[in-house]
Amino acid sequence: MKIKFQKYQGTGNDFVLIDNRSKVFPKDNTTFISQLCDRRFGIGCDGLILLENSEISDFKMCYYNADGKEGSLCGNGARCTVAFADFLKLIDNKTTFEASDGMHTAIIANEIIYLQMHDVNKIETFDKHSFLDTGSPHHVQMVEDLKTFDVFAIGKKIREGAPYNKTGTNVNFVEQISNNQFAIRTYERGVEDETLSCGTG
């Protein structure tokens, strides 16, 4: 099978993008998708995105994590999908598109893509962390010395542990640098590793 694809990245979060308006891509084949995402034996990426037709907007974004399973909203992936739709000449400078969490609008201005996210209606605060859903679930925890923090081991433990268990969550570790500056490192579910950035976190 020959598949045309493009590779995009948003602040280091990288994706394979495929025009699937003809519905030929085997999107139910999780093994195949995970093989394409594999960095050693495939193309290599944090996630795979299919651009499909939508009956209610300019296009539909279907996002798959590197494990091959369909994922929740990916903010950087959404910006890359808008850039891909622009490349395909499907949109002008403003677009409305469909994603897993509903409708989104985006604007392209001076080659920068501005994406409107959904408002966060609820933030749950606990002793050592907070939890919120921005279109994807996020466990947010303040830490010290973020540079040496073991994001992989601790992130994996939180992602797989209670109360998230099998469903899992993204895990953000945050260090406050100054009054209005923060550093963030993220363990992403589905990728099951730290990524260079996370658009929803």
Describe the residue ranges of each PLM region.
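A glycine-rich beta-to-alpha transition motif near the start of alpha/beta enzyme domains, typified by
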Residues: 1-110, 140-200
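Histidine (H) residue identity feature
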Residues: 104, 118, 129, 138-139
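Active-site glycine-rich loop that binds ribose-phosphate moieties when present
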Residues: 115-128, 153-156
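Short glycine/Trp-rich loop-beta-loop segment that forms part of the substrate-binding cleft
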Residues: 132
